[in-house]
Amino acid sequence: MYALIEYKGKQYKVERGSSIVVDNISEVAPGGCIDVREVLMIGGEGLTRIGSPYLEGVGVRAVVGECFRSRKITVYKYKSKKDYHRTIGHRQWYTRLTVSDILGV
């Protein structure tokens, strides 16, 4: 069984036991649980339910894993004929979630 969830404005396809990488979660410490109630669709084994936009009474419980940073992205700004250039680096924080259960199915 799988579910399509929306979390922080992005959509993810999850199954029980799978892990996903989302933008940083600073509200919950690693090892804690979160419940995602924005479930767009569930399906599998002859069962398909589609919400409009979300399903009522269905949720996904996930365990918060490690927080880590992505590889560095280098942004280079340049203006011709003005002797202006600037290099900026950025590393985004991410959190790994492990889906423990799909609730309300």
Curated annotation (Swiss-Prot):
The keyword rRNA-binding applies. GO terms for biological process: translation. One of its GO terms (cellular component) is cytoplasm. Part of the 50S ribosomal subunit. Contacts protein L20. HAMAP family: Ribosomal_bL21 (MF_01363). This protein binds to 23S rRNA in the presence of protein L20. The keyword S-adenosyl-L-methionine does not apply. Keywords: Ribonucleoprotein, Ribosomal protein, RNA-binding, rRNA-binding. This is Large ribosomal subunit protein bL21. It holds the Pfam family Ribosomal_L21p. SUPFAM superfamilies: L21p-like. Belongs to the bacterial ribosomal protein bL21 family. GO terms for molecular function: rRNA binding; structural constituent of ribosome.
